A protein has these predicted regions:
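Short, Lys/Arg-enriched N-terminal segments with co-localized hydrophobic residues
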Residues: 1-10
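Conserved helicase motor core of P-loop NTPases
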Residues: 3, 15-16, 39-40, 47, ...
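Long, low-complexity, intrinsically disordered N-terminal extensions of eukaryotic proteins, enriched
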Residues: 11, 32, 79-81, 246-254
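Conserved pre-motif I regulatory segment
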Residues: 16-50
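Conserved phosphate-coordination/catalytic loops
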Residues: 26-33, 146-154, 252-257
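Conserved SAM-binding loop
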Residues: 28, 82, 276
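Short, conserved phosphate/pyrophosphate- and ester-handling motifs at nucleotide-, phospho-/glycolipid
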Residues: 32, 86, 280
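ASCE P-loop NTPase helicase motor core
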Residues: 36-37, 41, 46-237
Length: 382
């Protein structure tokens, strides 16, 4: 009987891996193959409180491998839940996995009743059982009490408690150690295997993707990202130099050519696929004003079709909607309709109808226009 069970498990492993490879679409690199074997050991292991940690640099095929694994699990009728720390990260996760994804906060927290304090959230009940929870961009998961309105104040503690409170649930953390850790720490605690093992008593399975995929080798963006990562690992940076020639995905343009180049990108690829990255909010405001006036020909500061990002958790405007506990910092909203304007206490507001990524219903809210031109990440209390 033991030999039969062992043989059966080997056959299941091989079958599962074969389907993942078909969905992946390429031959596995050595580190991808090692990651696949480690995941299979985790998946079919018997340890009830085990966790899988998948780390990988840009261009190593991490997202493609995760997407293939997730969709293979679904084909095997295994329950999965996809999560990410921010609304934008959840949108990206959903995009490459072709499955719904949610923010961690919206999945694990529930608002307390009015007597206990408006805007105070406790850890919710986990109704999932026999489920694998995949969390992308895990480097952003903090342990500090940055927002005491949520649970214990430690997102990592609450996430692990929530997942393993459900029967036979397990967690897969996905991230890149080269990305910035949470504010106030030098490393990302959610990506440190030894820390997870000691702090939570978990059985940790770990894989690290380091091989750059062949189809990514000609990418100038990945070349420079790898170069910067190697420079950081070598010690303090004396001077940061980028190589911008000889790559199909990098075009160097002067300031005088930028508007024309942006206009062409908007027409060819769409606004969602065209972004300007700035070093400060001050410069972002200048680019925003120039693009709106000279490319989009939008005279108003705020109008229908605009995309805005929420910069502070809001517990008020979602209260009247059944499926919206709160509107989270980092959520992306599209302005569907603009209503009346109002000035109050020296600030400028507009009433708007908004659709927020991840929710089916639109909401009505007053939007503070001053944040659109603020040079800070959010308005200060002053």
């Amino acid at each position: 009987t033991a030999h039969f069970c062992l043989l059966n498990l080997v056959m299941i492993n091989e079958h599962f891996e074969r389907i993942v490879k078909e969905k992946f679409g390429f031959d596995f690199s050595p580190t991808q193959q090692a990651a696949m074997q480690s995941f299979l050991t985790f998946l079919f292991g018997r340890h009830p409180e085990s966790l899988f940690l998948l780390k990988g640099y840009a261009g190593t095929g991490k997202t493609s491998l995760v997407a293939a694994i997730v969709n293979t699990l679904l084909q095997f009728e295994q329950q999965v839940v996809l999560l990410a720390p921010t609304g934008r990260a959840a949108k990206v996760f959903a995009g490459y996995s072709h499955q719904p994804a949610f923010t961690i906060h919206k999945k694990i927290y529930r608002q307390k009743n009015a007597q206990e304090g408006i805007g105070i959230f406790s850890l919710g009940f986990n109704g999932n059982a026999n489920t694998l929870f995949f969390v992308d961009e895990a480097s952003m998961i903090s342990m500090g009490s940055q927002d005491s309105n949520f649970g214990s104040g430690s997102l990592l503690d609450d996430l692990i408690e929530f997942v393993y409170n459900g029967r036979n649930n397990r967690l897969v953390l996905i991230g890149d150690t080269a990305q910035l850790p949470p504010i106030g720490v030098d490393v990302s605690p959610a990506l440190e295997a030894e820390f997870l093992r000691v702090s939570y008593g978990m059985e940790i399975y770990e894989a690290n993707l380091t091989d750059i995929m062949r189809q990514s080798e000609q990418s100038g963006i990945l070349y420079n990202a790898t170069r910067v990562r190697e420079m950081i690992g070598a010690g303090p940076l004396a001077k940061l130099l980028f190589r911008v020639t000889g790559f199909p995905d990098i075009v160097r343009v002067s300031g005088g050519e930028l508007l024309e180049e942006l206009d062409q990108c908007y027409n060819s690829f769409g606004m969602d696929e065209t972004m300007v990255i700035c070093r400060s909010n001050k410069r972002a405001n200048r680019f925003n004003e120039g693009i709106r006036a000279r490319i989009l020909y939008r005279e108003e500061a705020f109008g229908g079709g605009d995309k805005i990002m929420v910069v502070k958790n809001n517990y008020f405007w979602g209260a009247e909607y059944d499926k919206i506990d709160f509107i989270a910092n980092g959520d992306i909203a599209t302005v569907e309709k603009v209503g009346k304007y109002k000035d109050l206490y020296g600030f400028h507001f507009v009433h708007a109808r908004l659709s927020i990524y991840g929710y089916e219903e639109e909401i009505s809210a007053w939007v503070m226009l001053d944040t659109l031109t603020s040079e800070q990440t959010a308005l200060s209390y002053d």
